[in-house]
C-alpha cells in the first residue's frame, strides 16, 4: 500500500532538532551529538515508514549529524587545541549550534509577531469580557501545544508497545483501508465516547498497515481542524478530542 502524504506543518530539520532539544531538556550549547543523532534518525525513519513527504534537507541534516558524530569520536591532538586552552572554536558542533540558536531566535520573533497580530485582531472583533469566567479560566491548567513531532514520538512508542506484545509467529493478512474511511471511523468513535478518546485506544488493530492508515487519518483530521490533540504535560498520555468538544 502506498500513501503519499504531505504535511505542511513539518518546518524542517532545524525545527525537529529544536523539538528534540526541548523535549529531552538538552543544553543547546553542549549538544550530546550521539544521542541527538540517534533520536533524529529515529524520527526520520518513522516519517519515511509512514510515507510522509520527507524533504531532502532532512536527509542532508542526517548526513551532517553523522559527520559531526564521527568527528567527535576522533582523538583530539594537543596541537589542535588553542594555546589558551579554549578549544570551543575547534568544536565540530559549533556551526550547528550557531544555526540552531539563530533559528530559535527567528521562531521566537515569529511567535511574538503572531501573538501581537492576534491581540490586535481581538481589539476589534471580540465581545465584552465576562471577568467572572476569565478568573476561572486562568486557574485552569491549559494543555500543551502538541506538535506533529510529538505525534510521531507517540506513534513510535505505540509501535514499540505493539511489537513487544506480538507473538513470535504471526499470520499477516493485508487489508487495504482508505484514509477517508478511517477518518470517518475515528469521528464516529469520538461521538460514541463523548467527544474524547485516548490516542493509543484508536489503534485496536495490531496490523502495521492499519496502524499507519489510522495515524495518517489522525493527521488529516488535525489538518482539517476536525479534531484537537491534547496533552497536559510533556510525556503524558495524548488524547484526541472532537473539535466541537474542545471548543
UniProtKB/Swiss-Prot annotation:
InterPro entries tied to this protein: ScpA (IPR003768), ScpA-like_C (IPR023093)
Disulphide bridges: none
Plastid is among the record's keywords: no
Gene Ontology CC entries for this record: cytoplasm
Annotated keywords: Cell cycle, Cell division, Chromosome partition, Cytoplasm
Pfam families to which the protein is assigned, alphabetical: SMC_ScpA
GO process annotations (BP): cell division; chromosome segregation; DNA replication
Primary location class: cytoplasm
Function in brief: Participates in chromosomal partition during cell division. May act via the formation of a condensin-like complex containing Smc and ScpB that pull DNA away from mid-cell into both cell halves.
Protein name, per record: Segregation and condensation protein A
Higher taxonomy: Bacteria, Bacillati, Bacillota, Bacilli, Bacillales
